[in-house]
Every structure is written in C-alpha cells, then in structure tokens.
Amino acid sequence: MAVPKKRTSISKKRIRKQIWKRKGYWISLKAFSLGKSLSTGNSKSFFVQQNK
C-alpha cells in the first residue's frame, strides 16, 4: 500500500527556493557582464571581428 510522504517544512522550502533564485541571479549577472564587455570591446575571452 502506498504511503504518503511527509510534508516539506516551510523553512526548508524557502531555503531551497532562495538557493534556486541565487543561482539564477549569479548566472544573469555573469551574462550581463559578458555582454557589457563584448559591447565595449574589453572582452578577453572572445575575439570579435570589428566591421570597418
């Protein structure tokens, strides 16, 4: 017979949600930083051809 799982506590749910949000925040910050460096031409990790 199937037994229902215990309910996840609110605090645990909040902690997991914050971790998930924090990961997204850092990824978006890195992406924004990379885009900024590409647009200004200061990128050291990408070689972008400039149209003359």
Swiss-Prot record:
Give any Gene Ontology cellular component. Answer: large ribosomal subunit
Q: Which domain of life is it from?
A: Eukaryota
**Coiled-coil residues:** none
A biological process term (GO) from this entry: translation
Q: Where is this gene product found?
A: Plastid, Chloroplast
Q: Which UniProt keywords apply?
A: Chloroplast, Plastid, Ribonucleoprotein, Ribosomal protein
Instruction: Spell out the InterPro entries in the cross-references.
Output: Ribosomal_bL32, Ribosomal_bL32_plant/cyanobact, Ribosomal_zn-bd
Predominantly, its location class is plastid
Q: Which Pfam families match?
A: Ribosomal_L32p (PF01783)
Keyword Magnesium present in the record's keywords: the answer is no
Q: State if GTP-binding is listed as a keyword.
A: no
Q: Which GO terms describe its molecular function?
A: structural constituent of ribosome
Instruction: Say which family it is in.
Output: Belongs to the bacterial ribosomal protein bL32 family.
Descriptive protein name: Large ribosomal subunit protein bL32c
Gene coding for it = rpl32
